[in-house]
Amino acid sequence: MQQSTLLKPVSCYGIGVHTGKRTQLTIEPAKENTGIIFIRTDISSENNYIEASYYNVSDTLLSTTISNNHKIQVSTIEHLMAALWGCSIDNAVIKIDGPEVPIMDGSSKPFVFMIECAGKKLQNAPKKYLKILKEIKVVNKDCELYCTPSEHITVDLTIDFSSKAIGKQNLNFGVQESFTKNIADARTFGFIKDVEYLKSKGLAQGASFENAIGIDEHDKVLNPSGLRYADEFVRHKLLDLFGDLYTSGISIVSAIKGYKTSHAFNNELLHKIFSDTTSYKFVTSNELS
């Protein structure tokens, strides 16, 4: 299997869920072995590019933010990163004229649509995978995330909220599953009381029922159209996981299991994997059974 990029550039406009500001984002083709690079076109400096890497993650409080050594940053990258992973795009340059990736409808589906419209191009370099060789685990109280050796990518993810609108949900994602069909359109979600507080602090300025699932104090989903899936919440958490893990710069081959995961946990797992060179090896598709 070969690396791939886009056939042609593709653009969109949208608002940032936290900044509330309208930005233009363009995904462009890139050469083999480039990886995923963000460029802030609103900053006229040669230091305006940021590699979408786990070691550049600078904030994980409400979303995943990456920054470079010059404190140039791009936030809320996880839904776009998940779409790039789900569409098997290895190399791309993402140009954006603001500090936050547009939230679109709160899922990865609009970005998947963009990539499908642009088309995919196979490149003259083999696609590589990161194969996990031993168990790697991160734990904090009752939250945990770990990966174990496997010949395929599988995920067993559980979320557990006190809200009756969400409750406890579990999802198993196997090699036969389709991210673009079953996961990509699951939207982000939040509680109205939290959104009101965040807005008072200058955050969530772009949040609305058009780009997020809203839950009130009575555990009721307020979106007029309701949910896209009964388990849309855990599907979106899986989407976030895939997006965050793709900041590894490579597709990970492992059996992954998580309970009450977060952006911080996802990033911590990557740091732990790459801190131990005996825990993984790079392989091509021909080396996978």
UniProtKB/Swiss-Prot annotation:
Keywords: Hydrolase, Lipid A biosynthesis, Lipid biosynthesis, Lipid metabolism, Metal-binding, Zinc. One of its GO terms (biological process) is lipid A biosynthetic process. Gene3D superfamilies: lpxc deacetylase, domain 1, lpxc deacetylase, domain 2. It catalyses: a UDP-3-O-[(3R)-3-hydroxyacyl]-N-acetyl-alpha-D-glucosamine + H2O = a UDP-3-O-[(3R)-3-hydroxyacyl]-alpha-D-glucosamine + acetate. Its cofactor is Zn(2+). It is an enzyme of class 3 (hydrolase). It comes from the Bacteria. The active site is at residue 263. Its EC number is 3.5.1.108. Catalyzes the hydrolysis of UDP-3-O-myristoyl-N-acetylglucosamine to form UDP-3-O-myristoylglucosamine and acetate, the committed step in lipid A biosynthesis. Belongs to the LpxC family. NCBIfam families: lpxC. This is UDP-3-O-acyl-N-acetylglucosamine deacetylase. The gene is lpxC.
